[in-house]
């Protein structure tokens, strides 16, 4: 429980810090605002991806496994919650489907031994490609 609280608190503190420093935090792709904000946005996205990986692929599956739930359920719950979170943020059904599928795939990779840092890098790359280049 402490790991999740720390990860979520860290993400919230960083987001608040960026806002207080005047860094634009926007759902708009980088081409829609000053080029200087791109680096700040990439750093923020990296921190968010890391926090999401800690929670959705680290803490949550581990806690569900501790409850002796079936393996399919310990994978389905975090994947559906992750997809639902991303749908709630922008209401995009395509994003819901992609996020849920990616979450399930990352959980599979995690079970096969992938580290959370590796998954956070993959998550960041996914966000940058799909969100900023494609605009989903």
Each predicted region: which residue ranges?
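Small-polar-interrupted transmembrane alpha-helices in polytopic inner-membrane proteins
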Residues: 7-11, 72-86, 103
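Alpha-helical transmembrane segments of multipass membrane proteins
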Residues: 46, 80-87, 104-108, 128
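Juxtamembrane helix-loop-helix connectors linking adjacent transmembrane helices
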Residues: 1-49, 66-67
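Hydrophobic alpha-helical transmembrane segments
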Residues: 1-5, 38-42, 72-77, 96-97, ...
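Membrane-embedded alpha-helical segments of multi-pass membrane proteins
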Residues: 35-39, 43, 51, 55, ...
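Active-site His/Glu-centered metal-binding helix of metallohydrolases
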Residues: 50-55, 59-60, 84, 88, ...
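Membrane-interface helix/loop boundary segments of multi-pass membrane proteins
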Residues: 52-77, 108-115
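Functionally important transmembrane alpha-helices
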Residues: 91-136
């Amino acid at each position: 429980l402490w790991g999740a609280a720390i990860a979520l608190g860290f993400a919230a503190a960083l987001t608040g810090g960026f806002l207080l420093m005047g860094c634009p935090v926007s759902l708009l792709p980088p081409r829609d605002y000053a080029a200087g904000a791109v680096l700040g946005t990439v750093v923020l996205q990296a921190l968010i991806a890391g926090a999401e990986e800690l929670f959705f692929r680290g803490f949550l599956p581990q806690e569900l496994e501790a409850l002796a739930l079936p393996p399919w359920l310990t994978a389905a719950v975090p994947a559906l919650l992750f997809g639902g979170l991303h749908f709630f943020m922008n209401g995009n059904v395509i994003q819901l489907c992609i996020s849920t599928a990616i979450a399930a795939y990352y959980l599979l990779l995690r079970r096969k031994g992938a580290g959370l840092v590796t998954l956070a890098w993959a998550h960041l790359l996914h966000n940058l490609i799909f969100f900023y280049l494609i605009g989903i």
